[in-house]
Amino acid sequence: MGPTASGKTALAIALVEQHNCEIISVDSALIYRGMDVGSAKPNAEELGKAPHRLIDIRDPAESYSAADFRTDALQAIEEILAKGKTPLLVGGTMMYFKALLEGLSPLPAADDEIRKQIQIEADTYGWNHLHDELKQIDPVSAERIHPNDPQRLSRAIEVYRISGKSLTELTKIKSEPLPYDVVQFAISPKDRKQLHLSIEERFKLMLNQGFVEEVRSLRERSELHIDLPSMRCVGYRQCWQYLNGDYDYDTMVEKAVVATRQLAKRQLTWLRGWPELNWLESGSDSNLTTVLRHCR
């Protein structure tokens, strides 16, 4: 695991070439078909060397939750173990890792009618008004959910209206944790400036590889819109807005790079509090040897 642009995929492929393991992707963008360039999806050559499970398993118009991931990942783990191989989970979607390792809380399924009502209230009174409501029913969640985060804010209120219990109450109840021994590694540059540089260079490479054209093709599909989870992936949202005419090309690039840096910061915040984690430095020649030592 590790922040975006830290070298996870390259190390994982090197591990597959040296050890009897099989990769399971832990990435909420790689699950979507047709979102290849902007998600830094492994290319055909890389997939030929090291096939990845749980990529290209959903259309961008479809939803996919942490619960869906846990179900799919557990099945993939069992299948890989049955072949006498080691499952190698690789990615940066920390909520997926957490769901797999710790289990999930029994949260109610989404209710379209309640969501529509919440959206109407937001359009009428504003998200700050709904955030004030959340402070009354779930102050702990209100403390960590920003008023400018409508997806999470709406979900917290929706959970309470469906169940009569706060998100904080329900998340204290967990299902069974992962029934396997796990060795965990995080890879990241020691220097934050180096990570920021890698992020900027990778986004410029994506642009040269046809990222704008990829998003333009997605926009042509009538069932896709900017508020879908798939289109909220970093880079895609900013490019979609650029194609809408919301701002110029240079501003799009700047906003996408900033959004990706913010994602990396959130990922690192998760990882700094992660238990039983072995840290690797991006680009270090000893990374492969270090991981293989734990595999034998």
Curated annotation (Swiss-Prot):
Keywords: ATP-binding, Magnesium, Nucleotide-binding, Transferase, tRNA processing. The gene is miaA. InterPro entries: Dimethylallyltransferase, IPT, P-loop_NTPase. Its cofactor is Mg(2+). It comes from Shewanella woodyi (strain ATCC 51908 / MS32). NCBIfam families: miaA. The record marks 93, 115 as: Interaction with substrate tRNA. Substrate binds at residues 4-9. Its EC number is 2.5.1.75. It catalyses: adenosine(37) in tRNA + dimethylallyl diphosphate = N(6)-dimethylallyladenosine(37) in tRNA + diphosphate. Catalyzes the transfer of a dimethylallyl group onto the adenine at position 37 in tRNAs that read codons beginning with uridine, leading to the formation of N6-(dimethylallyl)adenosine (i(6)A). GO terms for molecular function: ATP binding; tRNA dimethylallyltransferase activity. It is an enzyme of class 2 (transferase). ATP binds at residues 2-9. Residues 27-30, 151-155, 232-237 are annotated as: Interaction with substrate tRNA. This is tRNA dimethylallyltransferase. One of its GO terms (biological process) is tRNA modification. Monomer. Belongs to the IPP transferase family.
